[in-house]
Amino acid sequence: TEELEKMLAFWTGAGLKQVVVIHYDDEVGKQNLASVVDYLSKQGKQPKAISLQRNAKVDAKQIDELLKLKPDVLINTVLSGPAAEISRQISSRGLTVPMSSLSFVGAQQYIVAAGESGAGVSIAQVVPSATAQIPIVRECAKVLQDAGVTAPMNSTHLEACIGAKVLTEAMRRTKKPGNPEGLLNAMRNLGSYDTGGFIVSYGATKQHGSKFVELAMVSREGRLRY
């Protein structure tokens, strides 16, 4: 919800009116659509939407249907494959439609799949930039290097690394090692934990860890610009 609100606040603040949501035709997809509807209804606005089947290819007919909705901006909640295909097909028609995607899209996967068509798309990020000058970024970069990974660290790597560090800390605090319920209780009682310049917080009613959200734009060089 925080990611969707960040994207919608940006675009509605820029004066764009017709929001079109791209979502999966399943429970999670419908929840994403409902979040957008709820946010925009408070401004007296109503989004339009197009639903996709999971693991199905995006065809030209669906792009036709999407463009008939005359979007000012696309809010994407599907994975990198279909999102990239939509970007490529819109671009191949000589059109440009602003798009913002949930972090769920997988930034690096989208960038690779979309190619030049991905330039200008903004993607929500739930961790700091992979080039930020903070301890957790340096620590995770070293872990990847020590593991033999030669590619530059990206946001997906960093998010996984932070998750692993949080899980390791919870395991360290578990009173009964190897006990799933004990690990769950340790996570629930973790409280505020500084991973190294990036603080997460867990509790009985706090299970997301962080509300950090930034929008990063894909550059022409295929990099995320914060």
Predicted regions and their residues:
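Structured segments of extracytoplasmic/periplasmic soluble domains
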Residues: 10-14, 35-43, 65, 69, ...
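Segments of small-molecule ligand-sensing domains
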Residues: 146-158, 168-224
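Conserved beta-strand scaffold positions in the cores of enzyme catalytic domains, especially
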Residues: 47-51, 121-123, 215
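A structure-centric signal for secondary-structure junctions around beta-strands
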Residues: 16, 118, 210-212
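Extracellular/periplasmic periplasmic-binding protein-like sensory domains
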Residues: 87-161, 218, 222-225
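Extracellular/periplasmic Venus flytrap/periplasmic-binding protein
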Residues: 1-94, 130-138
